[in-house]
Structure formats: C-alpha cells, structure tokens
Amino acid sequence: MIITVINGSPRKNGATSKVLTYLYKDIERLIPDVKINYFDLSEVNPSYCIGCLNCYKMGKCINQNDKVEYIHDIITKSDGVIFGSPTYGSSVTGLFKVFTDRAHMMLERLLYRKPCIAVTTYENARGSKAISFIKSMVLDSGGYVCGSLSIKTGFNQNPITEKVESKIQKVSKKFIYCIEEKKNPPVLSQIYNFIAINAVLKPMAFKDIEQYKGIIDRWEEQGII
C-alpha cells in the first residue's frame, strides 16, 4: 500500500503538519508495511503555472526545476492521497493552490477513483471554506473524499487533543478500509465524473487531438477511455 501526504502549509512544523503526521503514523500503526510519501510544499517551493498548456500536449509540466512533476508521478502510483492545508484568508494557502495548478491534476483526472482525505486547521472561522476547496479539487481530479478533518486550534498550539486523536483514528481506519476493499466512489461522485468526462472533457479533447494528446494518453493509461 502506497500513501502520499501533501502538506500545503508554509510552516513545516505547524498545526497542519502535526495533524498530518499523527494521521500517517496512525496508518503506519495499523498497516506496518505501508509506504508513506510525505511532502512539505514549503520545501518544494513550487513555481507558478504559466498557462502554457504543455501538460495538455505532452502530459508533463514544462517546468522541471522543482519536484512538482516528481510528486505528480508519485501520486499516480499511490493507492490513496492525503491533502492538508491551514486556512489562510478563508481558503487554502497560496502554496497549496500553486501546487494544484502546477500538478495538472484536473483535466487528466490524476486522482481517478483514488480515495483521499482532506485536512485543514483553522483558528477562528472559515475552516469549512478551506476544506470545501480541497474536497472540490479532489472531485474535479477524479478522486473521492472518504474522510475529512477540520481542526480548530490556536496559533502555535498543539492541535492533537484526545478528541482530535479519536477523530483521526476513525478517519484513518475508514481510509484504509476504502483502499483495501477497493471501494467504489460514492454514487454522486461517479455520476459527476461520468458527466464531466463524457459531456465536457472528451468532446473538448477530441476536437483537437494533437493539442490534448498528453491528456488522452493519460486517460488511456487509467482506463478512462
């Protein structure tokens, strides 16, 4: 079992990191031979997407100067993915958004049928906005959220309370179950993706096969077409 964890916080040892670390260590406790790939985006420091659409044509980002394309390929091989971000300005961090732009996840359906966990931390309010962004990103990338954690905590405080531990343990068990049992995505998620692929994405891509060759090749690899 291969799990990839993405920490979208600029603070490497902040509250979001603590929640993600507890979560993946609990998964390791339950599945000792699991392989965890953990990435701090603050270390990756991804460059902005420049909108060149090379990923549509060639199936990879033209910018090879950071680890974003490497992480993209690791996610492709993963059985499940955990995404985390603190709440900044009523949403995810700019760092997290830059990564999702660069990783060309959505059109190619990078998370196709993969179970995911959405994690956010917040101090006062709007944690629901950040978690909503992550959930939408997962759905729009072909995956589904089988568990989420929205943790209220103060600045520089340890978010891991007894109550939070219990929540994390429940989410990790469900996540493992979804992976091991190869659970189908929820029906509404399947319907959404069916419509997105067949009514929107395929007509667009096959109208200009040369421009979207990289996307079409990825769909074939995933068994989407």
Swiss-Prot record:
Molecular function terms, GO-annotated: 4 iron, 4 sulfur cluster binding; metal ion binding; oxidoreductase activity
Keyword Metal-binding on entry: yes
Record's cofactor remark: Binds 1 FMN per subunit. Binds 1 [4Fe-4S] cluster per subunit.
Entry superkingdom: Bacteria
Function: Redox-active protein probably involved in electron transport.
The protein's assembly and partners: Homodimer.
Name of the protein: Iron-sulfur flavoprotein CD630_04720
